[in-house]
């Protein structure tokens, strides 16, 4: 049995050995929830890699977006080159979900484009988990809590072939079709097979190579893997497993039973609509469902077949869907990266999904079974996980409560770098003061990050700096993913010197070239100026030996005071450690390729609708810090906060402080939208 073996030229240093020891003891001692509080640049990923090696548990690493997931995937593959490191994120290049808007009578049809490379990696992840090996790490986004096929059915459809096995060629071909491979006589693509005499070639759906099976009569004579383009033989095997070409696999008998059950439920729902005098909805449901059933009978699938997944999975109404977690063994370890953002995401997915589907069901576009094609609820997710390690520089109250206040700290950086000092300066003439600091920083050969409160402020400040011949760009939620990647690359390579953003946390930026982080209007309390947000923002300067933070404010808020106090505490501990061990802080040198070489994995093209500028208050919800803050509150607390925010907005408008009023308006709309999506 393969075991995890960590490959690294470095050994744990600073706080890492003690953090690793405590976490390993916790895992082996059966502690369910642990929290690792690690400052930016302290090597949290390296520590978790050591924990994985020492505990030898299959591990799910959960990240809150594709960009950070791809970074983690790259790092874990380097740490564990001899083990199975897999990647599981949403495979949509863009996705417009099906929806119905009753107020305007608008039906929006589902529209999507699937990234074949990511689909291959998803299949590779599930295949690895069912392979019997325990040395498996899967790096996943929140996509892992959404429904996929039943692992039992998936496992039943695995085809095992052995040299000398007696099986007719046609019997193997039938098995391949049942595992959702399709026969081709033309182009040989992933998920297809071709037949040439007594030779069957199968292009595996989850790999870059194909399998060639040679027959001698009804006996398998030889099994090889080949290059699908050249036909060159790569390896020869005595036996091999061929995993299904799709996560949703259903046998013929099950399909016929499902069709009958769907028909019965359709009749009941149509009768209910008619009894309520809603004949239009009843007619609509009957026509749409009948069309889907005809497609299933003819082709074995239909558009939107996921809305019938409850039948195919043999689940009861209301029963949770199968997801990636079902493919793991019971003793797997969950590592939640940036937990202060990721955990609230888990809780937020169900409410938004359900509110959209309820409208479809109520107006006859879908059967009630569509409601069971959903992400996990937070309590379902929690119930499926045996042991969790939360990893964050700023753990939220949820993690601290679950860990019963016991936190493993990792404050010392292997490079000896200290937390950046924070200086508070007045808001008056803040832009002029900032420009002077920018020029000094550029002369030193470093880069600058500036965070503002609104998109408009970011764009206007960026244009103003450009007029002063300061090379600059801006980032916010309306800038496309690939454009953001290009902008970050330009910053690192010195094409631009200044990057302005509404909130730079969502990029997961590790930028050693940045020595100055400026926080404009730091005293404007809210989502983007909370203690956790300010701490995370300050951390962007923690990878540079000359890193520093400027907060422009006319008063020191509670959030600012907490951030400054905690930063000072950490600096004292770091300085004492460096002095005791004779360490001189060293500049971090990070490859510029780490993120960008993964660009084919993280490409996200917004749908035509999503690409339009968001209505006021919607874009702010895309920020994980905002989403995390909102979802961590209960309804009563949110309602109080909404009342207070509305009063502040009205006061700002009366005082003609329109920029502040606009910011508060956006926050209010964000809260109203979030609360509307919560389940009652």
Go through each PLM region and give its residues.
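ASCE RecA-like P-loop NTPase motor cores
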Residues: 1-593, 600, 649
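Acidic, low-complexity intrinsically disordered tails
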Residues: 1-5, 440, 576, 580-663, ...
């Amino acid at each position: 049995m393969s075991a995890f073996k960590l490959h690294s030229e470095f050994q744990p240093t600073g706080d890492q050995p003690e953090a690793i020891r405590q976490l390993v003891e916790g895992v082996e001692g059966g502690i369910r929830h642990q929290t690792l509080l690690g400052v930016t640049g302290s090597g949290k990923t390296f520590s978790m890699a050591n924990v994985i090696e020492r505990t030898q548990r299959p591990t799910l690493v959960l990240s809150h977006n594709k960009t950070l997931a791809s970074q983690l995937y790259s790092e874990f593959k380097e740490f564990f080159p001899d083990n199975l490191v897999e990647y599981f994120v949403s495979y949509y290049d863009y996705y417009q979900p099906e929806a119905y808007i009753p107020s305007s009578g608008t039906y929006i049809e589902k529209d999507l484009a699937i990234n074949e490379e990511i689909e291959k990696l998803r299949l590779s992840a599930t295949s690895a988990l069912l392979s019997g090996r325990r040395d498996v790490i899967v790096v996943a986004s929140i996509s892992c809590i959404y429904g996929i096929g039943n692992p039992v059915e998936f496992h039943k459809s695995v085809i095992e072939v052995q040299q000398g096995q007696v099986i007719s060629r046609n019997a193997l071909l039938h098995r391949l079709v049942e595992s959702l491979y399709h026969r081709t006589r033309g182009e040989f693509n992933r998920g297809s097979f071709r037949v040439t005499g007594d030779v069957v070639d199968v292009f595996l759906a989850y790999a870059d190579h194909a399998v060639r099976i040679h027959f001698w009569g009804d006996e398998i004579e030889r099994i090889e893997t080949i290059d699908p383009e050249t036909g060159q033989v790569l390896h020869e095997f005595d036996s091999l497993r061929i995993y299904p070409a799709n996560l949703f696999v259903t046998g013929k008998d099950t399909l016929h039973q499902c069709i009958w059950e769907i028909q019965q439920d359709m009749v009941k729902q149509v009768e209910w609509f008619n009894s309520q005098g809603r004949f239009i909805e009843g007619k609509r449901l009957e026509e749409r469902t009948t069309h889907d059933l005809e497609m299933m009978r003819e082709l074995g699938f239909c558009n939107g077949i996921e809305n019938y997944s409850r039948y195919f999975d043999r689940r009861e109404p209301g029963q949770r869907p199968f997801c990636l977690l079902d493919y793991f063994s019971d003793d797997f370890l969950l590592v939640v990266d940036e937990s202060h953002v990721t955990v609230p995401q888990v809780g937020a997915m169900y409410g938004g999904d359900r509110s959209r589907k309820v409208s479809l069901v109520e107006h006859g576009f879908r059967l009630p079974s569509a409601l069971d094609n959903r992400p996990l609820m937070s309590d379902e997710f929690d119930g499926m996980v045996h042991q969790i390690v939360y990893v964050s520089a700023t753990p939220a109250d949820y993690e601290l409560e679950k860990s019963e206040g016991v936190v493993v700290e990792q404050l010392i950086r292997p490079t000896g770098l200290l937390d950046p000092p924070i200086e508070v300066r007045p808001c008056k003439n803040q832009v002029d003061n900032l420009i002077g600091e920018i020029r000094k920083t550029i002369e030193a050969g470093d880069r600058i990050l500036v965070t503002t409160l609104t998109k408009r402020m970011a764009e206007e400040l960026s244009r103003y700096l450009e007029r002063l011949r300061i090379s600059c760009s801006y980032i916010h939620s309306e800038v496309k993913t690939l454009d953001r990647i290009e902008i970050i690359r330009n910053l690192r390579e010195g094409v631009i010197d200044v990057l302005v953003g509404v909130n730079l946390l969502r990029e997961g930026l590790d930028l050693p070239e940045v020595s100055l982080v400026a926080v404009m209007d730091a005293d404007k309390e809210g989502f983007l100026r909370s203690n956790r947000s300010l701490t995370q923002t300050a951390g962007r300067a923690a990878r540079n030996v000359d890193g520093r933070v400027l907060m422009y404010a006319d008063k020191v808020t509670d959030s600012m005071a907490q951030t400054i106090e905690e930063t000072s505490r950490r600096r004292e501990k770091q300085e004492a450690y460096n002095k005791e061990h004779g360490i001189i802080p060293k500049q971090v040198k990070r490859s510029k390729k780490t993120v960008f070489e993964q660009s084919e994995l993280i490409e996200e093209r917004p749908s035509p609708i999503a690409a339009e500028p968001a209505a006021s208050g919607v874009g702010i919800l895309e920020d994980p810090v905002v989403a995390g803050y909102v979802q961590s509150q209960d309804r009563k607390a949110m309602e109080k906060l909404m009342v207070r925010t509305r009063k502040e907005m009205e006061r700002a408008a009366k005082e003609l402080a329109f920029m502040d009023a606009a910011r508060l308006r956006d926050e209010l709309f964000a809260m109203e939208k979030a609360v509307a999506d919560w389940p009652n």
